[in-house]
From Swiss-Prot:
Chain residues that bind Cu cation A2: 196, 198, 200, 204
Originating gene: MT-CO2
Binding annotation for Mg(2+): 198
Mitochondrial intermembrane-side positions: 1-14, 88-227
Classification via InterPro entries: CcO_II (IPR045187), CcO_II-like_C (IPR002429), CcO_II_C (IPR034210), Copper_CuA (IPR001505), Cupredoxin (IPR008972), Cyt_c_oxidase_su2 (IPR014222), Cyt_c_oxidase_su2_TM_dom (IPR011759), Cyt_c_oxidase_su2_TM_sf (IPR036257)
Chief place of localization: mitochondrion
Binding site for Cu cation A1: 161, 196, 200, 207
Keywords tagged on the record: Copper, Electron transport, Magnesium, Membrane, Metal-binding, Mitochondrion, Mitochondrion inner membrane, Respiratory chain, Translocase, Transmembrane, Transmembrane helix, Transport
Necessary cofactors: Cu cation
Organism expressing this protein natively: Phoca vitulina (Harbor seal)
Name assigned to this protein: Cytochrome c oxidase subunit 2
Enzyme's top EC category: translocase
Length: 227
């Protein structure tokens, strides 16, 4: 999860988020090199007194600054497309959970179970226990098994919402009348916090998401107790 004054991205806790972090570093390095080159050329232009008033064309230079940007764009596009295909790929999910956005709470339904569903509301600040996080805690956490592929079906009952958990690299729009899907998987247990990431009204900032990833045996006990 994020912490105060954090300058970087949250720690990756899923394979997709690890790929996104690598892509971020890869792209940032390209931007840094381009910026350094541009600043160097500008500094030369400001400090040198040499001029080329007789130069009418420079075919070699034009060729270079056409081919080089094309190569740079390819170096950025290829890993980006790879990650996009990885995010869209859903192969034999072990569990499917349907989440619906409301003003201003989330509801969840475990579609593999006959009657396992609940609403998840933010806990008001005055009701928080010591150590709990303001604007991030909910009354019902989404308990999921770790090390398993989970399909999330996401939609909305009223207005546009967005179901987002940054540390897992997830952000999927919840659109009324449309069912979007995404997958999540994490290799270690823990609590993962997120929030609605689409302005949806006056209480938009009061729609937290809390995922509790646990070993499969713990998940089975929890699901049995909820039925």
């Amino acid at each position: 999860m994020a912490y105060p004054l954090q300058m970087g991205l949250q720690d990756a806790t899923s394979p997709i988020m690890e790929e996104l972090l690598h892509f971020h570093d890869h792209t940032l390095m390209i931007v840094f090199l381009i910026s350094s080159l541009v600043l160097y050329i500008i500094s030369l232009m400001l400090t040198t007194k040499l001029t080329h008033t007789s130069t009418m064309d420079a075919q070699e230079v034009e060729t270079v600054w056409t081919i080089l940007p094309a190569i740079i764009l390819i170096l950025i596009a290829l890993p980006s497309l790879r990650i996009l295909y990885m995010m869209d790929e859903i192969n034999n999910p072990s569990l499917t959970v349907k989440t619906m956005g409301h003003q201003w709470y989330w509801s969840y339904e475990y579609t593999d179970y006959e009657d396992l569903n609940f609403d998840s509301y933010m806990i008001p600040t005055q009701e928080l226990k010591p150590g709990e996080l303001r604007l991030l805690e909910v009354d019902n956490r989404v308990v999921l098994p770790m090390e398993m592929t989970i399909r999330m079906l996401i939609s909305s009952e009223d207005v546009l919402h967005s179901w987002a958990v940054p540390s897992l690299g997830l952000k999927t729009d919840a659109i009324p009348g449309r069912l979007n899907q995404t997958t999540l998987m994490t290799m270690r247990p823990g609590l993962y916090y997120g929030q609605c990431s689409e302005i949806c009204g006056s209480n938009h900032s009061f729609m937290p998401i809390v995922l509790e990833l646990v070993p499969l045996s713990h998940f089975e006990k929890w699901s049995t107790s909820m039925l």
